[in-house]
């Protein structure tokens, strides 16, 4: 496999890192990073059939980087060293068939950009990145982390607040980011999506103020046979359950043992209407 195009001097790649910046047990550092440089690295590795190669440092071309936003809080510039010992492998089908990631035994780690900063996304685009590549992962990540300014920027750039069955709204509600939830609703997100799952997951995670806010905006406590109440009980949040029970006098009392397995399979793509 010919990787000559990847090895062009000054060509920039990206990787996503967390805090601390450890990948596969390897502590990343600014500048040159070398890992297991004497081990054989296959030129192509199909992630559908094998586990991730443990002895590689991973990076992506700018076009695909938004596919990997959930993996951390920083965008790091990556460059490849001009070294005859450099070995590269193409990571096929990670995390899906449309994605393109590479691994190498050595990389040069460049500037760190915060994913909470809208300017980071401007830079991604400047480098050829697609903010909506294969969906709206960048928006979903920003909403989940409460990055209000980034959510605003991405929506203004064309990202869809209703993408993936309003998953951004559900994630922001689940994490208690009321300002982001308000923004998403203003931009067209549907509070009733998937049988009001923003309310159910806010209840599951014990976000009382979020629960009150969503109900004030029309979220249905009775959705799908009182799922939000069941989710509150499942999460051990009796106070939230009692608050919602007071809004449903027809139920009467419910014991703490009346819990619910909150697996997301409870929702299907066809499950979009409330069941009262």
UniProtKB/Swiss-Prot annotation:
Q: Acidic residues compositional bias: what residue ranges?
A: 255-276
PANTHER family (alphabetical): ANKYRIN REPEAT PROTEIN (PTHR24188), GH09064P (PTHR24188:SF29)
Repeat (ANK) positions are: 134-163, 164-193, 195-223, 225-253
The record's SUPFAM superfamilies line, in alphabetical order, gives: Ankyrin repeat
Q: Does the keyword Acetylation apply?
A: no
Give the record's keywords alphabetically.
Answer: ANK repeat, Repeat
Q: Which domain of life is it from?
A: Viruses
Q: What is the lineage of its organism?
A: Viruses, Varidnaviria, Bamfordvirae, Nucleocytoviricota, Megaviricetes
Species annotation? Acanthamoeba polyphaga mimivirus
Q: What is this protein called?
A: Putative ankyrin repeat protein R838
**Pfam families from the xrefs?**
Ank_2 (PF12796)
**UniProt xrefs under Gene3D superfamilies:** Ankyrin repeat-containing domain (1.25.40.20)
Keyword Cytoplasm among record annotations? no
Positions of region (Disordered): 254-276
């Amino acid at each position: 496999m010919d990787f000559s195009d990847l090895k062009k001097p000054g060509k920039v790649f990206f990787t996503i890192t967390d805090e601390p910046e450890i990948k596969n047990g390897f502590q990343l550092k600014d500048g040159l990073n070398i890992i297991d440089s004497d081990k054989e690295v296959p030129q192509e590795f199909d992630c559908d059939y094998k586990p991730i190669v443990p002895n590689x440092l991973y990076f992506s071309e700018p076009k695909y980087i938004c596919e990997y936003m959930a993996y951390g809080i920083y965008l790091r510039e990556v460059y490849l060293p001009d070294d005859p010992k450099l070995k590269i492998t193409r990571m096929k089908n990670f995390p899906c068939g449309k994605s393109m990631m590479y691994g190498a035994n050595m990389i040069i780690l460049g500037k760190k950009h915060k994913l909470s900063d809208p300017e980071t996304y401007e830079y991604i685009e400047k480098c050829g990145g697609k903010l909506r590549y294969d969906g709206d992962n960048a928006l979903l990540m920003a909403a989940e982390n409460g990055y209000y300014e980034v959510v605003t920027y991405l929506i203004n750039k064309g990202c869809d607040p209703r993408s993936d069955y309003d998953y951004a709204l559900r994630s922001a509600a689940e994490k208690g980011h009321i300002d982001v939830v308000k923004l998403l609703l203003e931009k067209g997100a549907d509070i009733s999506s998937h049988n009001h799952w923003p309310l159910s997951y806010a209840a599951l995670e014990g976000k009382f103020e979020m629960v009150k806010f969503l109900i004030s905006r029309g979220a249905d406590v009775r959705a799908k046979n009182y799922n939000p109440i069941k989710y509150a009980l499942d999460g051990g949040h009796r106070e939230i359950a009692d608050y919602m029970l007071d809004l449903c006098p027809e139920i009467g009392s419910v014991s703490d043992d009346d819990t619910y397995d909150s697996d997301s399979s409870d929702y299907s793509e066809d499950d979009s209407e409330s069941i009262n």
